Amino acid sequence: MINDIKKDAETRMEKCVEAFRNHISKIRTGRASPSILDGIMVDYYGSATPLRQLASVTVEDSRTLKINVFDRSIGAAVEKAIMTSDLGLNPSSAGSDIRVPLPALTEERRKDLIKVVRGEAEQGRVSVRNVRRDANDKLKALLKDKEISEDDDRRAQEDVQKMTDIFIKKVDAALADKETELMDF
């Protein structure tokens, strides 16, 4: 029973860290990455469709993405979707390919992005702590119902705390990597 609670907490904490990593991977660093365009939805015959389903996105060089649209007739719609996104990108057509040059980030913009990333990291830490609180509440309920002893409860809470510390360190490590990546250019 205690092991189930700990395993559940570990799984949920891992998901919190993964969600944080996925979220910050979409923050533009000046270096080309196909994940930058993950949130782009294209109007494809009247329905909003993710760009990934309509084209392949590859890195041409460190500052340029190349989009190869599967259906040439929607090239203009793909360009429009990228231009109207809040990414500040200006795509250009070159035959069947669309090239998306990424402008260099200014120092001020980098500092703003670092603030955003730090805020996201704090959200990640809060999520991990919420999972800890839920696990501790479940343990206290078992103790109250006399299904586990006080010693078992204390040991399990210590294990959950150790797990929490490990996952918060993972969030901090991902934050440090992203900050370094943002300031490297």
UniProtKB/Swiss-Prot annotation:
- The answer to whether keyword Protein biosynthesis applies is yes
Which Gene3D superfamilies does its entry note? 3.30.1360.40, Ribosome-recycling factor
Principal location listed in the UniProt entry: cytoplasm
> What GO biological process terms are annotated to this protein in UniProt?
cytoplasmic translational termination
Keyword match Cytoplasm = yes
Q: Which HAMAP family match?
A: RRF
Q: What is this protein called?
A: Ribosome-recycling factor
Organism of derivation = Erwinia tasmaniensis (strain DSM 17950 / CFBP 7177 / CIP 109463 / NCPPB 4357 / Et1/99)
Q: Which gene encodes it?
A: frr
